[in-house]
Amino acid sequence: LQLFHPEYDVQGVGKMIMEAGIAGQLAAKAKAANDVEEAEKQQKICDELTKGAYAKLHHDMQHFVTEASVEQLTAIKNSIAQCARKAQKAGIDAIEIHGDRLLGSLCSTVLNHRTDNYGGSLENRTRYALEVLQAIKEAAPSMMVEYKLPIITVNPDGSLRGKGGLLEDEAVEFAKMLDAAGIDMIQVAQANHTGNMGDTIPPMGAVPYNWTLGACEKVKAVVHCPVATVGRVVSVEAGEKILEDGTADIIGYG
């Protein structure tokens, strides 16, 4: 979830994508009925809507971010809780809170410059994430809840890799908070929010294999819930060794 500048019409994009899907279905039905003219007409509508939606989405998000109001944050939290409630009703067993994106932006000292209860101290910056967790647990008490914990890592030259998340020491402290709040599982991952795909999917040789494992091990040492690692774990053998060494409980391959 992101909040963009007012002219970035997120709902409008969603409507365009939905209408493109409908037009695509109508085109397929017309083609199946050998109605070439109608099929071409609907396919053209589908293509134009899809192109327009992607054009609106294709930009650097950082240039469009605004500070979310408390009212907006509350509305988003309530929507997330409603989604969790519906998921539980549908028979879903587990839900992952993606700790990057909006939550990671609020946690991050790089992106969060607020001066209210959601900015400044670690307690304030992580407040919203914990509120979201609590809202989900209240809305869907029988669901297993995982938190994807993004770590801002440090490159060999001292520069930061990733923006939306927490530096390692703060991430370990936040993991304790999540554990105390009743999280069922934590996945330690690389933070992103940089606009550079190479930060989260680094070029071959740019970072070592299993490069988030050190942070994962530190998190695992302070919590009681299972902890997963992800980040250039590319073979079954590597994953098995991590499990045998006890540095993580679950492996995210890739």
Named regions from a protein language model:
Residues 1-253:
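Flavin-dependent oxidoreductase catalytic cores
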